Amino acid sequence: IHRNRSKIKLFTRNLEDVTRQFPDIVEFVKRDINSKSFIIDCEVIGYDQKTKIWKPFQAISQRIKRKYNIEEMVKKVPIMILAFDILFLNGKSLLETPFEKRRNSLNSIIKSERFAIDVAKSIVTENVKTAQIFYERALLSGAEGVMVKNLKGIYKPGSRVGFGLKMKPVMESLDLTI
């Protein structure tokens, strides 16, 4: 999510502009983020309106590809924002800022609103058992995994390695004949 004063833009991981497809996110940003200039790294998650359970990514991919009847899709596939990092704030790049300070900055500007926007849950621990319990609870809540980050780590644009590690369950192998 990019914001520069009144201009708000939403981009996919591949830098596709999807602002038009997510008018609800634009409203969440205006209402719940207390800053007029930022770039936030986040995930958009679809959820079932009745059960409030997270949907798989394929559910929101319908909205990403949608060019028409957007308001209908907003109702059909409600979403929420889960913010996990901030790269730019009030005219200043935070790329060289340690993750712990970036996270504090992120927490300071977001007003969590259930089923609209939230900062990803986190813990700081050196205890393996505590980390394991956090991971298992994340999976039970419908998350696909957790990110493990170095509190002193800087942000590396476009990189999936360095100071972060994504932990997901290992899929069982399949024996298939095609």
Please report, for each region that a protein language model flagged, where it lies by residue.
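Catalytic cores of nucleic-acid ligases and guanylyltransferases
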Residues: H2-T177
